[in-house]
Amino acid sequence: MLTLARQQQRQNIRWLLCLSVLMLLALLLSLCAGEQWISPGDWFSPRGELFVWQIRLPRTLAVLLVGAALAISGAVMQALFENPLAEPGLLGVSNGAGVGLIAAVLLGQGQLPNWALGLCAIAGALIITLILLRFARRHLSTSRLLLAGVALGIICSALMTWAIYFSTSVDLRQLMYWMMGGFGGVDWRQSWLMLALIPMLLWICCQSRPMNMLALGEISARQLGLPLWFWRNVLVAATGWMVGVSVALAGAIGFIGLVIPHILRLCGLTDHRALLPGCALAGASALLLADIVARLALAAAELPIGVVTATLGAPVFIWLLLKAGR
């Protein structure tokens, strides 16, 4: 039994090392690739200082942090709701952030600065999170809380549809681009949003023990002495914060929170001591590679990154499911 545990631990370490190398390679490629290829030797030239340090680096850091946040949020929600299909958009938090952002765009007539839009998106996500916590205080079961989140998401989606229907053509273009996701407008002015993600990411990665208990189910977690009500509230709030900040940075991006944790579990990373940091590394790498494709696929335009993640990731996910079922 001890030998089996050691083998699993070594396998987890190997996976984390491989994912770390993949993330570093994706980071290097993201800084080099673009309309102009800039090799590392030219990064400190005048051209490199402009393109790499002022344009590509802040965008790359934002992609890394958002990818990690979405993947970890998916892992937390899948353990919390005992549902492999749970992901950040399922509880309505992503749509809540969207309602906040759309309200800011429409009421501000497209004139509000980016920091104000970011604050409105975070506020929308936190409002939905507070509503969910209100439900949680009534000691609803996990399945009922999940259904409440789905209902809130549907309501927020309807509100966004109504807002887009009555918006002007200029606002409509901005809103539609946001709904498809993208990092085109990210620069160092959004560094405060990036910094807002880091403490929460680090804190959740350290919560492997309660996460492992939650993954066993509500009854087992209570028998092991876990204060289920407390941890459910804390994790829902943490997820709401990370999703709200991510939406403020990049808009609505699906697939990452759903598939990355599931793929890592299929690969053998079931212990949250390895799964949580693995999700951060894999989510960051996957979203960064998708962002590179979005930038380079068309010569004169940029693809929405949400479309790229769904197009590239869904076939891989289906292949892994078929492989695991054999």
Swiss-Prot record:
Which InterPro entries does this UniProt record tie to the protein? Answer: ABC_BtuC-like, ABC_transptr_BtuC, ABC_transptr_permease_BtuC
Native organism: Escherichia coli O157:H7
This protein is called what? Answer: Vitamin B12 import system permease protein BtuC
**Compartment annotation:** Cell inner membrane
The cross-references to SUPFAM superfamilies, in alphabetical order and at most eight, read: ABC transporter involved in vitamin B12 uptake, BtuC (SSF81345)
Q: Which Pfam families match?
A: FecCD
Identify the residue ranges that face the Periplasmic compartment according to the record.
36-56, 108-113, 167-190, 250-257, 297-304
GO CC entries:
plasma membrane
Keywords of this protein's UniProt record, alphabetized? Cell inner membrane, Cell membrane, Membrane, Transmembrane, Transmembrane helix, Transport
Question: Which loops or segments lie on the Cytoplasmic side of the membrane, by the record?
Answer: 1-10, 82-92, 139-141, 207-228, 268-274, 325-326
**Which Gene Ontology BP terms does the record give?**
cobalamin transport
Coiled-coil regions, chain positions: none
